[in-house]
């Protein structure tokens, strides 16, 4: 399961909110996280953490969890 490809449903299940096309947002008490995806989603994406723009490539839930853990963002539903 942890190596599942990222899909829109998975992002929504993880607490990311679908704001507009190709923009997802996840909020915690201390962080405001936006996960941007382009038309080739999920091959390329940008993670924005407290206004810091971080280009990343994330293909699986495991990779997304690992990346967010580096930035101390706890997503409880993994």
Predicted region positions:
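Short acidic DE-rich linear segments
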Residues: 72-78
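Residues marking helix boundaries in flexible regions
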Residues: 7, 47-50, 74
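Negatively charged, low-complexity tracts enriched in Asp/Glu with abundant Ser/Thr
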Residues: 1-26
């Amino acid at each position: 399961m942890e190596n599942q490809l990222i899909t829109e449903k998975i992002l929504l299940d993880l607490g990311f909110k679908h704001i507009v096309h190709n923009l997802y947002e996840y909020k915690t008490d201390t962080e405001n996280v936006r996960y941007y995806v382009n038309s080739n989603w999920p091959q390329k994406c940008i993670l924005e953490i407290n206004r810091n723009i971080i280009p990343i490539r994330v293909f699986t839930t495991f990779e997304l969890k690992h990346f967010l853990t580096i930035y101390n963002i706890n997503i409880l539903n993994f």
